[in-house]
Amino acid sequence: MLPESFGGRIIYLLQQYGPSFLKGAGVSMWLALVGTLFGCIIGFLVGIVQTIPVDKNDSTAKKVIIKVVKFIMACYVEFFRGTPMMAQAMFIYFGSAYLFNINMSMWFAAIFIVSINTGAYMAETVRGGILSIDPG
Protein backbone atom coordinates (compact mmCIF):
# COMPACT_ATOMS: atom_id res chain seq x y z
CA MET A 1 0.00 0.00 0.00
CA LEU A 2 1.39 3.38 -1.03
CA PRO A 3 1.71 6.00 1.71
CA GLU A 4 -0.32 9.19 1.34
CA SER A 5 2.48 11.76 1.70
CA PHE A 6 4.96 12.61 -1.04
CA GLY A 7 7.98 11.90 1.19
CA GLY A 8 6.48 8.60 2.26
CA ARG A 9 6.00 7.58 -1.36
CA ILE A 10 9.61 8.44 -2.20
CA ILE A 11 10.89 6.38 0.72
CA TYR A 12 8.60 3.50 -0.25
CA LEU A 13 9.81 3.57 -3.88
CA LEU A 14 13.45 3.69 -2.79
CA GLN A 15 12.94 0.73 -0.48
CA GLN A 16 11.17 -1.27 -3.17
CA TYR A 17 13.22 -0.36 -6.24
CA GLY A 18 16.41 1.21 -4.90
CA PRO A 19 18.65 -1.84 -5.44
CA SER A 20 17.38 -2.29 -9.01
CA PHE A 21 17.90 1.41 -9.71
CA LEU A 22 21.47 1.30 -8.40
CA LYS A 23 22.24 -1.83 -10.41
CA GLY A 24 20.87 -0.20 -13.57
CA ALA A 25 22.84 2.98 -12.92
CA GLY A 26 26.02 0.94 -12.49
CA VAL A 27 25.43 -0.94 -15.74
CA SER A 28 24.75 2.34 -17.55
CA MET A 29 27.97 3.85 -16.21
CA TRP A 30 29.96 0.76 -17.26
CA LEU A 31 28.44 0.85 -20.75
CA ALA A 32 29.13 4.58 -21.09
CA LEU A 33 32.73 4.19 -19.90
CA VAL A 34 33.61 1.24 -22.15
CA GLY A 35 31.76 2.62 -25.17
CA THR A 36 33.36 6.03 -24.77
CA LEU A 37 36.82 4.49 -24.41
CA PHE A 38 36.44 2.56 -27.68
CA GLY A 39 34.79 5.59 -29.28
CA CYS A 40 37.77 7.78 -28.39
CA ILE A 41 40.14 5.31 -30.01
CA ILE A 42 37.99 5.20 -33.15
CA GLY A 43 37.63 8.98 -33.16
CA PHE A 44 41.34 9.65 -32.78
CA LEU A 45 42.18 7.32 -35.65
CA VAL A 46 39.47 8.65 -37.97
CA GLY A 47 40.23 12.28 -37.09
CA ILE A 48 43.94 11.86 -37.75
CA VAL A 49 43.38 10.02 -41.04
CA GLN A 50 40.98 12.77 -42.20
CA THR A 51 43.76 15.34 -41.84
CA ILE A 52 46.40 13.48 -43.88
CA PRO A 53 47.54 15.96 -46.53
CA VAL A 54 47.59 15.02 -50.20
CA ASP A 55 50.75 16.36 -51.83
CA LYS A 56 51.08 17.18 -55.52
CA ASN A 57 54.15 14.97 -55.72
CA ASP A 58 52.37 11.87 -54.40
CA SER A 59 51.67 9.04 -56.80
CA THR A 60 48.24 8.89 -58.38
CA ALA A 61 47.44 5.63 -56.59
CA LYS A 62 48.27 7.16 -53.21
CA LYS A 63 46.14 10.23 -53.97
CA VAL A 64 43.19 8.08 -55.00
CA ILE A 65 43.46 5.81 -51.96
CA ILE A 66 43.71 8.74 -49.54
CA LYS A 67 40.77 10.54 -51.15
CA VAL A 68 38.59 7.40 -51.12
CA VAL A 69 39.44 6.67 -47.47
CA LYS A 70 38.75 10.30 -46.51
CA PHE A 71 35.42 10.18 -48.35
CA ILE A 72 34.37 6.98 -46.59
CA MET A 73 35.34 8.39 -43.21
CA ALA A 74 33.54 11.67 -43.91
CA CYS A 75 30.40 9.67 -44.80
CA TYR A 76 30.76 7.69 -41.56
CA VAL A 77 31.09 10.87 -39.49
CA GLU A 78 28.20 12.65 -41.19
CA PHE A 79 25.88 9.63 -40.98
CA PHE A 80 26.48 8.81 -37.33
CA ARG A 81 26.47 12.45 -36.23
CA GLY A 82 23.33 13.14 -38.25
CA THR A 83 21.11 10.32 -37.01
CA PRO A 84 19.79 9.77 -33.48
CA MET A 85 21.61 7.13 -31.45
CA MET A 86 18.34 5.37 -30.71
CA ALA A 87 17.64 4.98 -34.44
CA GLN A 88 21.17 3.61 -34.90
CA ALA A 89 20.60 1.18 -32.04
CA MET A 90 17.31 -0.06 -33.48
CA PHE A 91 18.76 -0.49 -36.96
CA ILE A 92 21.98 -2.18 -35.84
CA TYR A 93 20.46 -4.50 -33.25
CA PHE A 94 17.20 -5.45 -34.97
CA GLY A 95 18.09 -4.64 -38.58
CA SER A 96 21.27 -6.69 -38.63
CA ALA A 97 19.35 -9.71 -37.34
CA TYR A 98 16.53 -9.25 -39.84
CA LEU A 99 18.49 -8.24 -42.96
CA PHE A 100 21.77 -10.11 -42.55
CA ASN A 101 20.84 -12.87 -40.09
CA ILE A 102 23.47 -11.58 -37.64
CA ASN A 103 22.41 -12.23 -34.06
CA MET A 104 24.58 -10.23 -31.69
CA SER A 105 24.28 -10.04 -27.94
CA MET A 106 22.65 -6.95 -26.52
CA TRP A 107 25.88 -6.04 -24.70
CA PHE A 108 27.98 -6.21 -27.85
CA ALA A 109 25.37 -4.18 -29.74
CA ALA A 110 25.21 -1.56 -26.98
CA ILE A 111 28.98 -1.14 -26.77
CA PHE A 112 29.27 -1.13 -30.57
CA ILE A 113 26.57 1.53 -30.97
CA VAL A 114 27.94 3.82 -28.26
CA SER A 115 31.47 3.36 -29.65
CA ILE A 116 30.70 4.19 -33.27
CA ASN A 117 28.50 7.13 -32.30
CA THR A 118 31.07 8.55 -29.90
CA GLY A 119 33.80 7.86 -32.45
CA ALA A 120 32.03 10.00 -35.04
CA TYR A 121 31.75 12.96 -32.67
CA MET A 122 35.31 12.51 -31.43
CA ALA A 123 36.64 12.27 -35.01
CA GLU A 124 35.16 15.65 -35.85
CA THR A 125 36.60 17.16 -32.68
CA VAL A 126 40.07 15.77 -33.41
CA ARG A 127 39.92 16.80 -37.07
CA GLY A 128 38.81 20.31 -36.16
CA GLY A 129 41.51 20.58 -33.51
CA ILE A 130 44.26 19.51 -35.89
CA LEU A 131 43.07 21.82 -38.66
CA SER A 132 42.89 24.77 -36.25
CA ILE A 133 46.64 24.63 -35.61
CA ASP A 134 48.46 27.33 -37.54
CA PRO A 135 50.85 25.74 -40.05
CA GLY A 136 53.26 28.45 -39.00
Language model feature labels by segment:
Residues M1-P135:
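Transmembrane alpha-helices and adjacent helix-loop boundaries
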